[in-house]
């Protein structure tokens, strides 16, 4: 079983994973940890170009994808904390897992209420008044996951309440995401 817990910063991904006993026996992976390691391996300074930043993020995504696949091949259950706003970022992970296993892949999209998001933002940075609006804008950019991407089940999590939903993505949108991925390589 692979469970992807996705969403913007400060939406409660880490809290959900840490406070869910189901994940005690799961291998836990957090994209933030992979990004930090990739940044360190690249010896990147604070001021890097967009191309360098993209390369670091790409490397982190490749490493977490490979680690997910290795854990699945070893028969382990995995929970992954990630942003994965775009379908084109989710597809390589799904396809890599499917290449080695038919294990269920579930995705959980964090969608806190404004009240909960404001509390989360205040816990992260009491001084930054723009954090809340910035994250609200990020949340609008998320492409809602669907079963047609290859997920066994799709869920929203709103203030701790887990709600299963079904939606189908337009085949043209799926094809566009695959084309964008191909063009990036």
Which residues fall in each region the model found?
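Short glycine-/polar-rich loops that comprise or flank the Walker A/P-loop
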Residues: 100-106, 148-153
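Conserved GTP-binding G-domain of TRAFAC-class P-loop NTPases and closely related GTPase folds
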Residues: 2-6, 11-15, 19, 23, ...
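Conserved substrate/cofactor phosphate-moiety recognition/catalytic segment
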Residues: 14-76
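Conserved beta-strand scaffold positions in the cores of enzyme catalytic domains, especially
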Residues: 25-30, 106-109, 154-156
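Pre-Walker A (Motif I) flank of P-loop NTPase domains
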Residues: 1-3, 75-76
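Short, hinge-like loop/turn segments at secondary-structure boundaries
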Residues: 44-48, 98, 123-127
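Flexible, glycine- and charge-enriched loops at secondary-structure boundaries
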Residues: 50-58, 83, 128, 132
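Glycine-rich phosphate-binding loop used to anchor ATP phosphates in small-molecule kinases
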Residues: 55-104
């Amino acid at each position: 079983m692979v469970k992807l817990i996705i969403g913007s910063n400060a939406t409660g991904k880490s809290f959900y994973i840490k406070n869910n006993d189901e994940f005690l026996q799961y291998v836990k992976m957090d994209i933030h940890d992979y990004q930090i390691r990739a940044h360190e391996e690249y010896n990147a300074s604070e001021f890097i170009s967009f191309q360098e930043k993209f390369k670091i993020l790409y490397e982190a995504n490749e490493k977490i994808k490979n680690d997910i696949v290795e854990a699945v091949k070893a028969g382990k259950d995995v929970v992954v904390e990630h942003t994965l706003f775009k379908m084109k970022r989710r597809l390589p992970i799904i396809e890599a897992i499917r290449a080695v296993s038919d294990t269920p892949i579930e995705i959980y999209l964090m969608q806190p209420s404004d009240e909960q998001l404001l509390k989360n933002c205040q816990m992260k940075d009491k001084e930054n008044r723009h954090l809340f609006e910035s994250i609200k804008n990020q949340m609008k950019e998320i492409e809602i996951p669907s079963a047609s991407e290859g997920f066994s089940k799709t869920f929203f999590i709103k203030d701790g309440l887990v709600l299963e939903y079904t939606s189908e993505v337009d085949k043209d949108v799926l094809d566009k995401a695959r084309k964008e991925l191909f063009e990036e390589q």
